């Protein structure tokens, strides 16, 4: 059929109609559709869409895959998440990338002329052969270690796309190409630079470690234990009397957290227990042995101690209970740790040790166990209830009407327990045995502790974490997967929470504790940073050392270019400058800080009553999160790395954020947000959907002279001075050849606030540089890039979430802030209603006393209560103290009128509040913040201008 068409451009259209009946199916199955989808992405990856201007769409949706590198991202994640090295040949026929394989097995994804070669072929051998051979040579040169080719290859995953002339395959499925390399029609040489990057990606280090395993195993054998009657020379170890004997199978080795825990455990043991129970105190956390070098493992004192205590031999398998009884000094390991997240981590590290080194022991039912001890107790009269995790307690508190009447005792660690309580623990013996669940147990333990499985941990935390999910402490057997998913996950989540902030307030835990303490102390007058950090530790239960706290306080107060757009604390003293990126701050003993006046405009005091405060050992500490009136997470920018996650967000202009929220509230369109750095004189330019170019500033002042007036954000003045010195001296390449100097001389008039370098080039050199690609910006390194694609943050449910862009983050923030206004309004209505009721009752009470309608003299408390009740006075907090405790001088006619005026004013304010919408409340506070920010910004600009006009000494380099 010949049909006329409107288009003048030639094209080919291929359609097919599957004969479902012929294939015995009713339609396309999900697997078939998945295959089509996979092939669709394959086509996108191997077709040069930019050059040929070909567009791809599947079911009407355009593909986001534009090149082979983006296709690789679908396998291993974005470049920011997973390291890889990419290279393409000059002829355009070859492009390839290498990453570290997730398991110890070589993997390849390859294409020949657009055909997916699942099984590989000569083209794969051709490229991987070069990579492995050159890596062997590189490692031998750098490390003086001869590495087997298989040791390198098994670490790699290769992505390869190539064009071969007349390729031949071993079957009609074309999944293996067997054309010899001399008939490829082109050649590909893997560059030395590519090899160096692959080696530094971690391949060289791992290959060296694996190569040395054989030799080091000999050393490991020297630390082996054996089943002996006694073990000597192990510090702080208390051996069971029957260990190493014919009855060793009934002996239990307790691994506890520290010496204080050991003392408590000893006090709880009976004489019979001492025969079968041994105790070894761990010094903090065990080494994560997964992926570690054998040398590091054999040099670890705790691990070598455990080998001797248990009689463990390196490389030996203990498959059955009988093997344990015959070869080991103990028949069971019991872990006793604090009931907090760090205790869970120690349990996990113990499991990981045996799973890595003696995996068969993790499969023997009950060989590894732990004892549950209370994290808190609730007492009322003679009744005592024990709770073994926060989830149990919170569920009980919610379900118990009189929970507030119970006395709560927290057991922060095992050291909190008394001797009689330890005796109780061993009498009750709430021992939980770990159970092996086939391959799922192996996978989940490896996933949590394998450094190479960061992406899997990321998925695990996002999909599995729930703040109210805890182990059922009534169980006597728990699978490894259940332990990891319901207990250990809280440690990983908390580890992230210390490094990655909440999207609502943009604060990490330490910063939130600092802000909480500043608000609690009403820090409106200056205090030494060292003193304030002590106050924070005491009042917010900060447990990670005051050194890191001092650093966090200093960072919150810094206000140089590239630090904070809004510093929540004031820097009264030397808190660091852009000269050295804040590293030049003075000691915390000599500098002072206080709340910035703008801080309460961002975090209104009226919110404090409706925040959800956390509880630490019975002490009210910081809230779960603050709810600032603009998304503060975007004000100062964020950088953080946690378990499997990282977060990187540039800062934005507070004025733009105020306008964004205002427009959302009033139904107006919102403008695109562009990263902003307070005081930065350069430019920020969008170059991709999620990528920005940051440029410094220079001015040409003569034929061979420029003045650099701004550096890209994050490049500090002294760092750049060193760079200029190197450019003036000339550089030396890796072969020792020295190149000519790029600049002739430079002069620095830089201050701690402003950049001012005068750079002189050799005669005629500047014109040459300006004419070259990238020009002065590139040569002088006056540009850098930032991305907005790595936004992982905690949401309102305390779950980690990936935000595709900042607008999506603002959407989530907006709903949480709106709900906070709703809670605040209801709380204020209740507070004002109660105040009006109290004032009404007080006015009426004074009036009744004045007219002798009530006479409380010589009356019992019971009679007084009955009299007030009969006159319809309201009880407040269950009694009438607010009335009967009123001073006698308040019982006057004037006070009646005063109380009624206060009541009427309160009722008027209440009515105004009821008529005020949530939007109006928010807009009013945005207006106030905008005015406050205007003053704040002017003050910063004035400070910068004042420094700029000061006379500075001249520094010349020649």
Sequence positions of predicted segments:
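Conserved phosphate-chemistry cores used by DNA topoisomerases
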Residues: 1-958
């Amino acid at each position: 059929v010949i049909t006329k068409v409107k288009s003048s451009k030639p094209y080919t259209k291929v359609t097919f109609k599957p004969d479902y009946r012929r294939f015995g199916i009713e339609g396309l199955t999900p697997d078939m559709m998945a295959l089509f989808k996979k092939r669709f992405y394959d086509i996108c990856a191997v077709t040069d869409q930019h050059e040929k201007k070909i567009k791809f769409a599947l079911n009407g949706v355009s593909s986001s895959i534009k090149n082979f590198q983006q296709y690789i991202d679908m396998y291993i994640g974005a470049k920011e998440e997973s390291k890889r090295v990419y290279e393409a040949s000059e002829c355009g026929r070859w492009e390839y990338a290498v990453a570290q394989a997730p398991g110890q097995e070589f993997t390849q994804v390859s294409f020949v002329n657009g055909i997916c070669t699942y099984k590989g072929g000569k083209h794969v051998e051709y490229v991987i052969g070069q990579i492995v051979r050159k890596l062997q040579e590189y490692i031998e040169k750098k490390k003086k270690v001869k590495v087997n080719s298989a040791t390198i290859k098994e670490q790699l995953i290769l992505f390869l796309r190539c064009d071969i002339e007349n390729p031949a395959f071993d079957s009609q499925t074309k999944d293996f190409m067997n054309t010899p390399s001399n008939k490829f029609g082109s050649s590909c040489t893997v560059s030395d630079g590519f090899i160096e990057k692959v080696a530094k990606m971690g391949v060289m280090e791992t290959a060296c470690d694996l190569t040395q395993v054989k030799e080091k195993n000999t050393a490991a054998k020297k630390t082996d234990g054996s089943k002996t009657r006694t073990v000597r020379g192990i510090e702080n170890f208390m051996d069971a009397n029957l260990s190493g004997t014919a009855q060793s199978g009934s002996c239990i080795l307790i691994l506890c957290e520290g010496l204080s825990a050991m003392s408590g455990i000893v006090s709880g043991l009976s004489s019979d227990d001492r025969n079968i129970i041994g105790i070894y105190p761990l010094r903090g956390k065990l080494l994560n042995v997964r992926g570690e070098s054998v040398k590091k493992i054999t040099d670890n004192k705790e691990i070598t101690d455990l080998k001797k205590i248990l009689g463990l031999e390196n490389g030996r398998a203990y498959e059955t209970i009988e093997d344990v009884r015959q070869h080991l000094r103990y028949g069971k390991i019991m872990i006793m740790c604090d009931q907090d997240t760090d205790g869970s981590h120690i349990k996990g590290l113990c499991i990981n040790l045996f799973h890595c080194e003696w995996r068969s022991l993790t499969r023997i039912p009950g060989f590894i166990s732990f004892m549950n001890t209370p994290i808190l107790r609730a007492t009322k009269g003679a009744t005592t209830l024990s709770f073994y995790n926060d989830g149990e307690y919170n569920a009980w508190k919610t379900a118990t009407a009189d929970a507030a009447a119970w006395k709560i005792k927290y057991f922060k660690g095992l050291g909190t327990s008394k001797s009689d309580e330890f005796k109780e623990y061993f009498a009750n013996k709430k021992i939980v045995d770990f159970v092996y669940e086939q391959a799922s147990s192996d996978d989940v333990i490896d996933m949590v502790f394998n450094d190479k499985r960061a992406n899997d941990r990321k998925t695990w935390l996002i999909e599995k974490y729930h703040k109210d999910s805890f182990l059922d402490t009534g169980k006597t057997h728990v699978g490894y997967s259940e332990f990891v998913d319901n207990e250990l996950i809280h440690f990983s989540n908390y580890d992230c929470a210390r490094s990655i902030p909440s999207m609502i307030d943009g604060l990490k835990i330490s910063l939130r504790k600092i802000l909480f303490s500043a608000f609690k102390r009403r820090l409106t007058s200056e205090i030494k940073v060292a003193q304030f950090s002590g106050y924070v530790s005491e009042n917010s239960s900060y447990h990670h050392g005051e050194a890191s706290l001092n650093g966090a306080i200093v960072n919150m107060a810094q206000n140089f270019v590239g630090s904070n757009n809004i510093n929540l604390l004031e820097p009264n003293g030397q808190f660091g400058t852009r000269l050295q990126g804040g590293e030049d701050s003075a000691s915390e003993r000599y500098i002072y800080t206080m709340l910035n006046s703008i801080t309460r405009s961002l975090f209104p005091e009226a919110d404090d009553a409706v925040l959800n405060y956390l509880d630490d050992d019975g002490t009210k500490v910081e809230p779960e999160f603050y709810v600032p009136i603009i998304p503060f997470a975007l004000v100062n920018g964020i950088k953080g790395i946690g378990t499997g996650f990282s977060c990187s967000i540039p800062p934005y202009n507070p004025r733009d954020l105020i306008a964004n929220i205002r427009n959302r509230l009033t139904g107006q369109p919102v403008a695109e947000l562009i990263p902003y750095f307070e005081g930065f004189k350069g430019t920020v330019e969008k170059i991709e959907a999620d990528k920005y170019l940051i440029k410094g500033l220079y001015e040409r002042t003569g034929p061979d002279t420029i003045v650099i007036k701004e550096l890209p954000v994050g490049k500090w003045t002294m760092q750049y001075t060193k760079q200029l010195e190197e450019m003036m001296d000339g550089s030396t390449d890796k072969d020792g050849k020295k190149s000519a100097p790029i600049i002739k001389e430079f002069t620095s008039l830089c201050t701690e606030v402003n950049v001012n370098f005068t750079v002189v080039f050799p005669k005629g050199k500047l014109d040459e540089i300006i004419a070259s690609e990238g020009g002065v910006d590139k040569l002088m390194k006056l540009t850098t890039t930032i991305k907005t694609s790595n936004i992982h943050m905690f949401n309102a449910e305390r779950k980690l979430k990936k935000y595709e862009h900042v607008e999506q983050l603002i959407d989530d923030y907006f709903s949480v802030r709106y709900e906070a206004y709703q809670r605040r309004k209801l709380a204020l209505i209740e507070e004002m209603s109660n105040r009006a009721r109290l004032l009404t009752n007080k006015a009426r009470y004074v009036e009744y006393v004045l007219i002798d309608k009530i006479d409380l003299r010589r009356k019992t408390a019971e009679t007084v209560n009955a009299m007030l009740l009969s006159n319809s006075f309201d009880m407040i907090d269950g009694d009438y103290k607010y009335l009967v405790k009123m001073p006698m001088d308040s019982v006057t006619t004037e006070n009646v009128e005063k109380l009624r005026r206060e009541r009427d004013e309160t009722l008027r304010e209440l009515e105004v509040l009821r008529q005020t919408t949530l939007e109006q409340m928010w807009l009013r506070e945005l207006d106030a913040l905008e005015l406050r920010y205007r003053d704040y910004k002017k003050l910063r600009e004035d400070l910068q201008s004042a420094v700029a006009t000061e006379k500075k000494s001249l520094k010349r380099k020649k």
